């Protein structure tokens, strides 16, 4: 009888733990979703303030001062909902899971590679953002896989803390491997000697045209917007 009672209690405890576990795992994504939407609202609030500026230029310097000293720009991609600050810190992993206000957030933030200069004067400036479950950050870059959308949307903009607007012409898209020389090598600088080699890398992994390849020269400043194939996919 005692053994039966003990087994009965053990079973009840296991059932309770199972219920708690089920609740936790169903609650956790919901909590993340709410937190992510709250962060989206904060960015929208900042956006409302910045669009009041002359020429619709986000006041990056003011956002940096009032919100987060890690803000190094603002990215706007017409035709998508990408319209928010770019952050940068010495640790590339930090903004993978932290918000504009430095709170933990699974969808992270859009951020500039730690190796890049914050004035975007590198030959290759990698900007990262998650492909998320709430259709924000860099999720809508996937729209560029539609040829019609791609044809109609050929530019995007980065605004700097010097009140500059950098206009980028979109020249290609593609799938790059996790080990990609343009990124894994420290501060790649184009020279007359290596230009052909790096043009070859771009042509191999993207749909860039030969004409656009030939437009790339040693003084080119390229921004490479990078995300993963799927949410939680680290190999895209």
Give the location of each predicted region.
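N-terminal Lys/Arg-rich, disordered targeting/topogenic segments
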Residues: 1-7
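Solvent-exposed, non-transmembrane regions of membrane-associated and secreted proteins
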Residues: 18-236
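Hydrophobic H-region at the start of alpha-helical membrane spans
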Residues: 8-21
């Amino acid at each position: 009888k005692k053994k039966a009672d003990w087994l009965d209690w053990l079973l009840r405890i296991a059932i309770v733990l199972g219920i708690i576990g089920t609740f936790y795992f169903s609650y956790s994504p919901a909590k993340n979703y709410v937190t992510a939407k709250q962060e989206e609202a904060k960015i929208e609030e900042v956006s409302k303030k910045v669009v009041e500026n002359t020429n619709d230029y986000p006041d990056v310097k003011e956002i940096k001062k009032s919100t987060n000293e890690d803000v190094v720009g603002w990215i706007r991609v017409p035709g998508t909902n990408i319209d928010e600050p770019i952050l940068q810190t010495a640790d590339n992993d930090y903004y993978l899971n932290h918000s504009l206000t430095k709170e933990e957030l699974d969808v992270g933030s859009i951020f500039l590679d730690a190796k890049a200069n914050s004035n975007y004067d590198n030959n290759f400036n990698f900007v990262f953002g998650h492909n998320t479950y709430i259709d924000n950050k860099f999720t809508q870059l996937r729209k560029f896989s539609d040829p019609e959308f791609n044809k109609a949307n050929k530019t995007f903009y980065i605004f700097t803390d010097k009140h500059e607007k950098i206009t980028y012409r979109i020249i290609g898209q593609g799938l790059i491997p996790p080990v990609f020389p343009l990124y894994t090598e420290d501060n790649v600088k184009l020279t007359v000697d290596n230009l052909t080699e790096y043009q070859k890398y771009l042509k191999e992994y993207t749909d860039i045209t030969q004409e656009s390849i030939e437009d790339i020269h040693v003084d080119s400043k390229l921004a490479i917007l990078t995300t993963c194939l799927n949410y939680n996919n680290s190999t895209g």
